[in-house]
Design a protein with these regions (language model features):
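Secretory targeting signals
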Residues: 1-4
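N-terminal export signals
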Residues: 8-28
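Phosphate-coordinating loops and pocket residues in cytosolic domains that bind phosphorylated ligands
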Residues: 11, 107, 133, 198, ...
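Short, glycine-/small- and polar/acidic-enriched structural segments
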Residues: 28-158, 165-170, 174-180, 184-190, ...
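Generic structural marker for isolated residues within well-ordered, non-membrane alpha-helices
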Residues: 52, 149, 193, 256, ...
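Pocket-lining segment of extracytoplasmic ligand-binding domains
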Residues: 91, 172-261
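Secondary-structure end/capping motifs
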Residues: 228-306
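Conserved C-terminal helix/tail region of periplasmic/extracytoplasmic solute-binding proteins
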Residues: 300-324
Length: 324
């Protein structure tokens, strides 16, 4: 009979936990530091819905979600290496031309059906022509809300500066400025505007969905380091993201509950927003060259950049379309 030495037994006992640790390490989720350019966005609640539906777990990803007070602040975090992947505005692609080490990797949301220009309920402003020369609050300079305000002014024939743009960050700060008489209105999530209407505090005078038919309201960006050193993790993230979009299209009730928590409005409002906006979400992240041209040319037209960047310098098409 074969004799088993004490050394063999001890060695096996020591090796077993090492094998287990090795397997656990292999199965450990990849952490992604994920940022939203603003916190209370129905479109950006996709990340939270993916968490609630355990889609990130299925993709072996631990998503560490943070939110900022606008595109410019998120771009600072991307530059500082504090964020791996972010969701921000289409015009925010222009930050690449300013030296931010991040680039668009997937289209996310088409024309801005999710944004409104809101005034106080008591405001004398009733229609768009009343906005000439008025002070409109946006999140940050160079952000989507800035871009939309300047584009609206330009379309009205007033030039890009026919409406005064004031960057005041998050909605509470802008609403307070309106109540003090320091602002005449603000560009915000339509859902938040509906909530202010129900509270008797505000009034949406327009939605921005028709301002540009070929356009990206929101895009997904990734840092150069993420693209170069963790491309497969990025691919898994994008697969999880668009799996979540597919789930959202098929499960309105589930989406409404999570969306209401994230956007911090009533479920009845999120239900209304869902019906109006779900069709604007990209299903695979593929880029529309016409929309890219609209954005890059507008960056100079509206004074956000002093030149028109080359298309390929602001987006990367190697990761899309995404198959789920």
């Amino acid at each position: 009979m074969r004799r088993i030495s004490r050394r063999h037994v001890v060695g096996s006992a020591l090796a077993a936990p090492l094998v287990m640790l090795s397997r656990r390490a292999a199965l450990a989720a990849d952490t992604i530091r994920f940022a939203k350019s603003v916190p209370n966005s129905f479109a950006f609640s996709t990340a939270d819905i993916g968490t609630d539906a355990r889609i990130w777990t299925q993709e072996n990803i631990e998503l560490a979600i943070s939110a900022f007070r606008g595109d410019a602040q998120m771009q600072q975090a991307l530059t500082a290496g504090a964020v791996d992947i972010g969701v921000g505005s289409g015009p925010g692609l222009g930050f690449r031309a300013k030296g931010v080490p991040a680039i668009g990797v997937a289209a996310m949301y088409g024309p801005p059906t999710n944004l409104a220009l809101t005034v106080l309920a008591s405001s004398p402003i009733k229609t768009v022509p009343d906005l000439k020369g008025k002070r409109i609050g946006v999140t940050t300079l160079g952000s989507l809300t800035d871009w939309l305000t300047r584009k609206l002014s330009q379309q009205q024939g007033w030039g890009p500066d026919g409406i005064q743009v004031l960057p005041l960050g998050a909605v509470p700060a802008r609403l307070a400025a309106m109540e003090r008489g320091e602002l005449d209105g603000m560009v915000i999530e339509a859902a938040t505007g509906y909530e202010l209407e129900e509270q008797g505090k505000g009034r949406n005078i327009m939605l921005f969905g028709d301002i540009e038919k070929h356009f990206y309201t929101h895009v997904i960006v990734a840092t150069d380091e993420m693209i170069e050193k963790r491309p497969e993790v990025l691919r898994r993230f994008l697969r999880g993201w668009f799996k979540t979009i597919a789930l959202m299209r098929a499960n309105k009730d589930f989406v409404v509950k999570t969306g209401a928590r994230v956007v911090q409005v009533r479920e009845s409002i999120v239900s209304r927003v869902y019906d109006a906006q779900i069709g604007s979400f990209s299903s695979d992240g593929a880029w529309d060259p016409v929309a890219i041209d609209v954005i890059r040319n507008s960056l100079k037209e509206l004074g956000i950049l002093d030149f028109v960047p080359e298309a390929k310098t602001i987006y990367n098409d190697k990761f899309v379309p995404v198959k789920i």
